[in-house]
C-alpha cells in the first residue's frame, strides 16, 4: 500500500493515483503526483529541442513513467519492468522524499542510506534554511 500520508496528500490534490518511473540516480522507483511530472515535463520542454540531453531526460523520465491508480485499499500494481529496475523480489520499502516518495528493495536502501548520510553531512552547508522561511525560526 502507498503510505497513507502520501495517498491522502494526492487525494487532497484531486488525484486517485501516482506517477511512477525508474530512478536514473539509483536502483529505486520514483513516485510523484501528476503536478510534479508536469513540472518535470515543462523543465525538459524548456531545453533546446535539438540537444541530446533533452532526449535523454525525456526518454529516462517521461517515456518510462506510468500512471498507476489506487485500488480501494490504497494499493498500486507495479509493473514487472519497474520491479526489475529496483531489483524488488519479495518485499519493498516506501521512502518519503517530501512531496514525492521512492520505492526500494529494503537491503539496497539500507546501503544507499549510509552513503546518503555521509554525503548529506559533507554538503550540509548547501541547505539554506532561512531562504525557505519568512520568520526567524531558521536563524
Roles of regions detected by a PLM:
Residues 1-29, 34:
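A positional/architectural concept
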Residues 30, 34-68:
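Helix-adjacent hinge/juxtasegments
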Residues 66-89:
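Beta-rich strand-turn-strand
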Amino acid at each position: 500500500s502507498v503510505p497513507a500520508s502520501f495517498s491522502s496528500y494526492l487525494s487532497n490534490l484531486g488525484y486517485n493515483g501516482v506517477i511512477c518511473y525508474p530512478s536514473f540516480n539509483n536502483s529505486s522507483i520514483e513516485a510523484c503526483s501528476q503536478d510534479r511530472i508536469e513540472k518535470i515535463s515543462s523543465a525538459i520542454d524548456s531545453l533546446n529541442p535539438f540537444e541530446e540531453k533533452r532526449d535523454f531526460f525525456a526518454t529516462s523520465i517521461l517515456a518510462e513513467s506510468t500512471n498507476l491508480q489506487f485500488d480501494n485499499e490504497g494499493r498500486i500494481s507495479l509493473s514487472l519492468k519497474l520491479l526489475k529496475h529496483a531489483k524488488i523480489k519479495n518485499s519493498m520499502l516506501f521512502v518519503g522524499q517530501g512531496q514525492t516518495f521512492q520505492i526500494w528493495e529494503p537491503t539496497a536502501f539500507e546501503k544507499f542510506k549510509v552513503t546518503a548520510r555521509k554525503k548529506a553531512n559533507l554538503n550540509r552547508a548547501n541547505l539554506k534554511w532561512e531562504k525557505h522561511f519568512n520568520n526567524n525560526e531558521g536563524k
